[in-house]
A protein has these predicted regions:
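Two-component/phosphorelay signaling modules centered on CheY-like receiver
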Residues: 13-31
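Active-site residues of response regulator receiver
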Residues: 54-55, 82
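Short hydrophobic/Thr-rich beta-strand motif most characteristic of the beta2 strand and flanking loop
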Residues: 7, 27-37, 42
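Acidic catalytic/metal-coordinating carboxylates
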Residues: 35, 61-64
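The short loop immediately C-terminal to the conserved phospho-acceptor aspartate in CheY-like receiver
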Residues: 12, 55-56
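Conserved active-site segment of CheY-like receiver
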Residues: 11, 81-85, 104-106
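Short amphipathic alpha-helix used as the core "switch/output" element in two-component signaling
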Residues: 63-75
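Short, flexible helix-to-coil linker/hinge segments that flank and couple to helix-turn-helix
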Residues: 88-95, 99-131
Length: 131
């Protein structure tokens, strides 16, 4: 079976490297990007099954990351990584099209289950922030 292709977008190289380590045994991490132009190019290439993106990647248009990804490829599934656990942030990400939201502080435990759930067509929110 072909491994699912993952794009990681985060402005912090150390975080991207950690995410890659968490996923490398089960998924093919094809590309890691750190800025909006690279994220745009990668999403528009259509070569990914899933995107894992930091909510805080700066977007010049003022849009947030989930809205940008959804606008670029409405069918692409994606998981948002965030340090924010406020319900309003979760609601905004899900309303914008994210299928998963994982807190950075719980990514070691939550990221692989989130990716599995989202690839299976489900929604995943880190258990520590579910209301």
């Amino acid at each position: 079976m072909q491994r699912k292709r993952i794009l990681i977008a985060d402005a912090h190289p150390t975080m991207m490297a950690g995410v890659r380590l968490l996923l490398r045994d089960r998924f093919e991490v094809i590309l890691m990007v750190a800025d909006e132009p690279s994220l745009r190019d990668a999403v528009e290439s259509g070569q990914f099954d899933l995107v894992i993106a930091d909510l805080s990647v700066p977007i010049s248009s003022g849009e947030n990351v989930p809205r940008l990804i959804k606008k670029l490829d409405p069918e692409l599934r994606f998981v948002i990584l965030s340090v924010h656990d406020e319900p309003a942030v979760v609601d905004e990400c899900l309303a914008a099209g994210a299928k998963g939201l994982v807190l950075k502080r719980t990514a070691v435990d939550d990221l692989v289950p989130a990716v599995d759930a989202v690839l299976a067509g489900k929604v995943y929110v880190s258990p520590s922030i579910q209301t």
